């Protein structure tokens, strides 16, 4: 973990933005951490299915992520990393959506940590193969959330934030970036 990321982890009060990137629906959730206790701020989703142009979807993901950062001033972002699927085109689109959300965070110099879906599920439910419904119900219980959303992409975004809370302070919490310079330094082969 980088030094600036360590500083935010050690703060007694912080806000974590969790993002579940997608080109049909982007889910997101925010939690506040005070004195090592978390509380629910909000969760929602960005509906993108009505847009046919993939580039418009990417622009909207970027803009919504910037809007969330500017409105809530998160100290950290936790983002679900793409899982490996059989459909290469779907994987490319998902990777682009994740990259655009990460670029928005990096442009505002908010530290970002990626988590694999299994790690998020394990942190929330104790089962890396838990269903979306199981994750949602566990979050509902842990954060005293009233009614769950119809689509569970919002709870997936919230789960990324909660996973990051549970993993904060551990030495190996995932891939962390604190800005473009840190990203380039850690990924020299991705930049040409």
From Swiss-Prot:
Positions annotated to bind Mg(2+) 2: 80
UniProt cross-references to InterPro entries, sorted A to Z: RNaseH-like_sf (IPR012337), RNaseH_sf (IPR036397), X-over_junc_endoDNase_Mg_BS (IPR020563), X-over_junc_endoDNase_RuvC (IPR002176)
GO biological-process terms attached to the record: DNA recombination; DNA repair
Residues annotated as the enzyme's active site: 20, 80, 153
Record text on subunit structure and interactions: Homodimer which binds Holliday junction (HJ) DNA. The HJ becomes 2-fold symmetrical on binding to RuvC with unstacked arms; it has a different conformation from HJ DNA in complex with RuvA. In the full resolvosome a probable DNA-RuvA(4)-RuvB(12)-RuvC(2) complex forms which resolves the HJ.
HAMAP family named among the record's database cross-references: RuvC
Biological role stated in the UniProt entry: The RuvA-RuvB-RuvC complex processes Holliday junction (HJ) DNA during genetic recombination and DNA repair. Endonuclease that resolves HJ intermediates. Cleaves cruciform DNA by making single-stranded nicks across the HJ at symmetrical positions within the homologous arms, yielding a 5'-phosphate and a 3'-hydroxyl group; requires a central core of homology in the junction. The consensus cleavage sequence is 5'-(A/T)TT(C/G)-3'. Cleavage occurs on the 3'-side of the TT dinucleotide at the point of strand exchange.
UniProt-recorded name of the protein: Crossover junction endodeoxyribonuclease RuvC
Originating species: Christiangramia forsetii (strain DSM 17595 / CGMCC 1.15422 / KT0803) (Gramella forsetii)
Gene name, Swiss-Prot/TrEMBL: ruvC
């Amino acid at each position: 973990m980088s030094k600036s990321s360590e500083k935010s982890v050690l703060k007694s009060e912080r806000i974590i933005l969790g993002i579940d990137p997608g080109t049909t629906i982007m889910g997101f959730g925010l939690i506040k951490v005070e004195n090592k206790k978390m509380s629910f701020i909000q969760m929602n989703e960005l509906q993108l299915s009505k847009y046919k142009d993939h580039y418009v979807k990417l622009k909207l993901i970027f803009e919504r992520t910037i809007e969330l950062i500017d409105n809530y001033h998160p100290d950290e972002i936790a983002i679900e990393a793409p899982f490996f699927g059989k459909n290469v085109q779907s994987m490319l689109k998902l990777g682009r959506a994740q990259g655009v959300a990460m670029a928005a965070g990096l442009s505002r110099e908010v530290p970002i940590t990626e988590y694999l879906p299994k790690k998020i599920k394990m942190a929330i439910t104790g089962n890396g193969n838990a269903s979306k419904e199981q994750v949602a119900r566990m979050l509902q219980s842990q954060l005293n959330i009233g009614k769950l959303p119809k689509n569970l992409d919002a709870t997936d975004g919230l789960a990324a934030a909660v996973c990051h809370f549970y993993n904060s302070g551990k030495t190996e919490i995932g891939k962390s970036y604190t800005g473009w310079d840190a990203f380039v330094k850690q990924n020299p082969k991705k930049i040409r």
